[in-house]
């Protein structure tokens, strides 16, 4: 096992091993020599990848899947207390470890960069992982999405840097002690866990307080929530700001769209740097600059890291081109919060100009729809036409009166052309029928709407 890794994690069992965060930790543990086992609801490419690393992956949740000699059981906040494997762990006296504690253990003895914020964590973490790898620095990383290249959400590297997403949704990011922390933005999103912006600020203040002595907080200068956090933290932590604001420490001078790419010019430590970002959208350019500033804070020369950022070609579901058929491009977006929806739609508009943008949107979570349904509808008004599916519940039970109709009504009030569809399986044919050559179709949401992109392409090919 790697230095600093508790022996209690030499035979871990993961409940929900196929999840983005869980699978990454499982992969790193397997690469470090642990005897990894776990269970997931269904077969997947992730399950196959884990098996290829020597892990045992069971399909379905059952008490007998948990080996009596497991050293610990790893869970995320999404695992219910009545899960049969969790119940069995209690009966056997096997320690239960939260995903965040396992990740914190993996980072012990290394130089962690923890990437936090309401939006953009996966992209920024990925940009750092790819660019640092491009420079042969051998980083370890744990990402909440799958890279286009090198094709994994996690890796045990031989270098001293560990890049990880830091999730605020359940306050698990309080477990980490980073040398560099990034805060991309601060908004109220996870309404089941936070009642107010004050609670959000307090949570991010706690996170920033975990930065090791001599460490650095890299934080957005253009986002009001981040600026307020900076004001609250004044004098308590070394801070480097980035953005287009004149007072930013790392100032963005320009973001020039170039089709599905951007050219970004910044000033860092008095030197002007111009580099390419291989994904479209101003928000992704800002993510790249955050990565650049974080690398510089760790001592990686910006003049070397900036060109290496061009090696980042995207994360699955983050404006990922799924294909083209009948002259129609189909792109997948993970956006599920109004801010993300707006940013991705604006990025696509900048990329395609006057071409029509059609959106197939699947709301994610009843609680989020209850609080932000109006804003989601307003965001959809940026598209030329939208189809809205029923809410993807994920871990939540229904809330009376909360349906996707809240979004549809708000979209229509904002002047949007929107069609509600309750039969998800019928939506690919409907969207394909709406599209014509030159259009761009965007499947949008954090649920299983991603599976519909290939089906739309199939319909277009008929």
Curated annotation (Swiss-Prot):
It catalyses: UDP-N-acetyl-alpha-D-muramate + L-alanine + ATP = UDP-N-acetyl-alpha-D-muramoyl-L-alanine + ADP + phosphate + H(+). One of its GO terms (molecular function) is UDP-N-acetylmuramate-L-alanine ligase activity. It is found in: Cytoplasm. GO terms for biological process: cell division; cell wall organization; peptidoglycan biosynthetic process; regulation of cell shape. Pathway: Cell wall biogenesis; peptidoglycan biosynthesis. InterPro entries: Mur-like_cat_sf, Mur_ligase_C, Mur_ligase_C_dom_sf, Mur_ligase_cen, Mur_ligase_N, MurCDEF_pg_biosynth, UDP-N-AcMur_Ala_ligase_MurC. ATP binds at residues 117-123. Its main location: cytoplasm. Keywords: ATP-binding, Cell cycle, Cell division, Cell shape, Cell wall biogenesis/degradation, Cytoplasm, Ligase, Nucleotide-binding, Peptidoglycan synthesis. It holds the Pfam family Mur_ligase_C. Its EC number is 6.3.2.8. The keyword Cell wall biogenesis/degradation applies. GO terms for cellular component: cytoplasm. Transmembrane segments: none annotated. Belongs to the MurCDEF family. Cell wall formation. NCBIfam families: murC. This is UDP-N-acetylmuramate--L-alanine ligase. It comes from Streptomyces coelicolor (strain ATCC BAA-471 / A3(2) / M145).
